[in-house]
Amino acid sequence: MSKNVVVIGTQWGDEGKGKIVDWLTDHARAVVRFQGGHNAGHTLWVNGKKTVVRLVPSGILRPDVECFIGNGVVLSPEALLKEIDELEAAGVNASARLKIAEGCPLILPYHIALDQAREAAKGDAKIGTTGRGIGPCYEDKVARRALKVIDLFDPARFETKLKENVDYYNFLLTNLFKAEPVSYEAILADTMKMAERIKPMVADVSRTLYDLDKAGTPILFEGAQGTLLDIDHGTYPYVTSSNCVAGAAAPGAGVPPQMLNYVLGIVKGYATRVGSGPFPTEQENEIGAFLAKRGNEFGSVTGRPRRCGWFDAAALKRSIQINGVSGLCVMKLDVMDGLEEIKLCTGYMLDGQKVDILPFGSDAVTKCEPVYETLPGWTGTTVGVKRWEDLPANAQAYLKRIEEVCGAPVDIVSTGPDREETIVLRHPFGL
C-alpha cells in the first residue's frame, strides 16, 4: 500500500500550495483535486516560467503524473476547456492525462448570473465572492437539482433538467434582483458542444484511485482555499462554499479515510486574507504594505490585492487541530528578509479573557485582540537557501518558535517560488 499525502492550506488560502504540490509530484504519480472550483488559482514557477492552474491539478506539468478532478469539485466546462487550451498551447499534454469524476456538479451561466446579482445587491455587506458561480452550484448540489458531468451522456435528461433549472434561476434573477434572464437555448447549445470534448476525459475516479493505491502508487490530494475559509470551520459567513479541510479529501475524491496517511499544512511566514471578513493580525500600515509589495500579494485568478498581517499562531493551532496536520510547510520566508523585528500572535484577548486558539465564527474573531511576542528579524538573505544550516540564526529561531507555539513540526521551508528553492527537513512521502 502506498503512502499518500493531503496538502491543505491552514490560513485564508493563497498560502502557496501550488508550488509545493508541483514539487511533491517529483515523487507522487497521481494528483487529485477534491473540492472547490475555478475560484482559486495555484501558481507554479518552473525554471523561471509562470503557470497558473485553477481546475486542473498542479501535477499537470509533470508528464508522468496522472491528474484527477474528484466529485467534490464543481466544474465549469468553459473554464476547464479554456485552461486545457492554455496548457496545451504551452506544450503540456493536459487532456490525455486528466480524468474527471462523473459526479462533479456543473457550473453553468445561471450560477454565475445569480452569484454576481447577489453580490451586487448586497453592496457594502457583500461576502467578497469571486462571482464565478461556485456557491450557487454547491447550493444546487445540496438541493438535489444539480446537473452533473454524468448528465452530459444523456442529452434528453440534460435538456429536461436544464429547462427546469433555467426557469427557476430566471425567476430569481428577474423577480428578486431585477437582472437579465439567461437563455436556455444558448446554454444548451454551448454545453452540448463542450460536452464532446469533456466526455472522453470522464472516468470512475473513485475506483481508479482505489486501484492505484492498492498497486502502491503514491497519491497526492490537492486542497484549494484554506481551513479558515472552510464552510463549517472558517470565519462564517465570510467563507467559501466547500469544506477545505483534510478530511474532505475522502468524500471529495471517493476514497476511504484510511488512504490519507500524511497531512501537510501549508502556511505563509506571515498572514494574508482576500476579501471581507475578520483578520485579527492585519497590519493596515507600512508593515502590511511592505509584506504586500515584497510578497507580490495579488490574487492569481482575481488580481485582487491581499490584506497582509503578522503570523497568527493561535489561528494555526485551530487549523492543526481540525486537519490533524502531520507537518508544516512554511512558505515565503524570504519575504520577511530585512525586517528589524517580527511579531508572532500567540493568542488573543476576547471579552477580557486570554484565549490561545481561534474562536468559532466571525463575530467572536472580530472581537479578538491579538497578543504578540516580538522576535528579532534577520539581515541576511534567505532567498534560494536549500539547507537549514544556511538560514540566518534568527530565521531558524523564528521557525522553531512557530513549532513550539503551534505544536506541529516544520517539515519544509520555501525560500523562493521555484521548485528548487526548498529546504526539506522531513519528506511527506517518507523519502
From Swiss-Prot:
Cofactor: how bound: Binds 1 Mg(2+) ion per subunit.
GO biological process, one term: 'de novo' AMP biosynthetic process
Family per record: Belongs to the adenylosuccinate synthetase family.
Annotated active site: D14 (proton acceptor), H42 (proton donor)
Quaternary assembly: Homodimer.
One Gene Ontology cellular component: cytoplasm
SUPFAM superfamilies: P-loop containing nucleoside triphosphate hydrolases (SSF52540)
A GO molecular function held by the record: GTP binding
Cofactor: Mg(2+)
Pathway: Purine metabolism; AMP biosynthesis via de novo pathway; AMP from IMP: step 1/2
Entries under InterPro entries matching the protein: Adenylosuccin_syn_GTP-bd (IPR018220), Adenylosuccin_syn_Lys_AS (IPR033128), Adenylosuccinate_synth_dom1 (IPR042109), Adenylosuccinate_synth_dom2 (IPR042110), Adenylosuccinate_synth_dom3 (IPR042111), Adenylosuccinate_synthetase (IPR001114), P-loop_NTPase (IPR027417)
CDD domains linked to this entry: AdSS (cd03108)
Annotated PANTHER family: ADENYLOSUCCINATE SYNTHETASE (PTHR11846:SF0)
Subcellular location: Cytoplasm
Any Pfam family hit: Adenylsucc_synt
Enzyme class: ligase
Keywords in alphabetical order: Cytoplasm, GTP-binding, Ligase, Magnesium, Metal-binding, Nucleotide-binding, Purine biosynthesis
Residues where substrate binds: S300, V301, T302, G303, R304, P305, R306
Signal peptide limits: none
Binding site for IMP: D14, E15, G16, K17, N39, A40, G41, H42, T130, R144, Q225, T240, R304
Catalysed transformations (reactions): IMP + L-aspartate + GTP = N(6)-(1,2-dicarboxyethyl)-AMP + GDP + phosphate + 2 H(+)
Matching NCBIfam families: PRK01117.1, purA
Binding site for Mg(2+): D14, G41
Role this protein plays: Plays an important role in the de novo pathway of purine nucleotide biosynthesis. Catalyzes the first committed step in the biosynthesis of AMP from IMP.
The protein's name: Adenylosuccinate synthetase 2
